[in-house]
Design a protein with these regions (language model features):
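Non-catalytic, topology-defining segments of multipass membrane proteins
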Residues: 1-65, 74, 99-207, 269-294
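Long helical/loop segments within the catalytic core of UDP-sugar-dependent glycosyltransferases
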Residues: 66, 245-256
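Transmembrane alpha-helical segments that form the membrane-embedded catalytic/substrate-channel core
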Residues: 66-78, 108, 206-232
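Juxtamembrane helix-capping/reentrant segments at transmembrane boundaries
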Residues: 81-107, 127-141, 231-246
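A short, ordered amphipathic alpha-helix with a cationic face
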Residues: 89, 177-178, 249-251
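Membrane-helix boundary/juxtamembrane motif in polytopic membrane proteins
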Residues: 167-173, 206, 229-243
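Histidine-centered catalytic micro-motifs
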Residues: 72-81, 112-124, 220-227, 252-268
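Juxtamembrane/interfacial segments around transmembrane helices
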Residues: 87-95, 114-118, 144-155, 228-238, ...
Length: 294
């Protein structure tokens, strides 16, 4: 039943929004657990299947691209402790999903968690938001920015922001882990190439990881925050409709059309953001969110 919000005060709107949000918070989001661990297992399975000729390399490449594109969001849930909070008996599972799901893209959970919390705290701040570097007027310029980030000499904004926290043991450890992850990936690729699997290394790991990261930055970072102009809690993220449609289009953007709900209520798991949005939509619009057709 839709609420008439036209005569509600700001305090009443805030109370109604919180009451709706509470209905979608809680429980273990098992879908994200299966997604994160299952996606990693599928990617690992590609290697023996392709190397033994059971699966053609071109098919392995397509699956690997999908694996890389799916690698981040389960870790994202873990970053917010949505699988299990501190002190919960399943906290180990939260951390396992956080670490394992992003192994294919060679990004450590520690650095992703720190920078993502900074993103939430300073969304769209040019100096403090680690994701502000994804700012671009158009989607293809955003993709091009990502391509440029793959070039030699590129300065990673995540590293820059963490280096400013020099002396912080958590930040120092995250930077060390990031170096070890990248070094490990390079050594693994060199070893595979030296062993006669250069094409497999390129098409099952290196190239899919670049494609997946570009897709993730476009859908998870650029699209929900463009034009990156405002910093208010209800103005720094938008609700939007991809190509004017829902259904398959929402799947292709991995639910990011409802990313405004995540920024307002990060304890709501990804797959509940849509239902939560539609229930609180009128309230959010009354509170001034940018709504591009959703």
């Amino acid at each position: 039943m839709r609420q008439d919000v036209s005569k509600m005060s700001e305090a009443e709107l805030a109370k109604a929004e919180k009451e709706i949000a509470r209905k979608y918070i809680g429980g273990v989001p098992w879908m994200m657990v299966v997604w994160g661990l299952g996606n990693f297992v599928v990617w690992l399975t590609l290697w023996p299947l392709v190397m033994t000729g059971v699966m053609p390399l071109w098919a392995g490449f397509l699956v690997a691209c999908l694996n890389m594109s799916l690698a981040y969001l389960p870790s994202h849930e873990a970053q917010h402790s949505n699988i299990a909070k501190e002190g919960h008996p399943l906290r180990w599972l939260n951390e396992l999903v956080g670490h394992v799901s992003t192994l294919p893209v060679a990004y450590p959970y520690s650095i992703l968690r720190i920078t993502h919390m900074l993103h939430h705290a300073h969304t769209n701040d040019p100096e403090k938001d680690p994701d502000f570097n994804n700012n671009a007027p158009t989607w293809y310029q955003s993709v091009w920015h990502t391509v440029e980030s793959y070039q030699p000499g590129y300065v990673d904004p995540y590293a820059v922001i963490l280096q400013k926290r020099e002396g912080d043991p958590i930040a120092d450890r995250a930077l060390t882990e990031a170096v070890l992850y990248k070094l490990g990936m390079v050594l693994a690729l060199i070893t595979l190439a030296w062993s006669g699997y250069a094409l497999e290394a390129f098409l099952l790991w290196w190239l899919p990881s670049k494609i997946g990261i570009a897709y993730l930055k476009l859908c998870l970072s650029w699209a929900p925050h463009v034009p990156f102009a405002e910093q208010g809690r209800y103005r720094n993220t938008r609700a939007w409709r991809f190509f004017g449609g829902m259904g398959i289009w929402n799947v292709l953007t991995m639910g990011m059309q409802y990313h405004i709900v995540h920024h307002l209520h990060p304890a709501i798991p990804l797959f509940r953001n849509g239902p939560a949005y539609w229930e609180m939509r009128d309230i959010l619009i009354a509170r001034g969110i940018p709504n591009d057709g959703l």
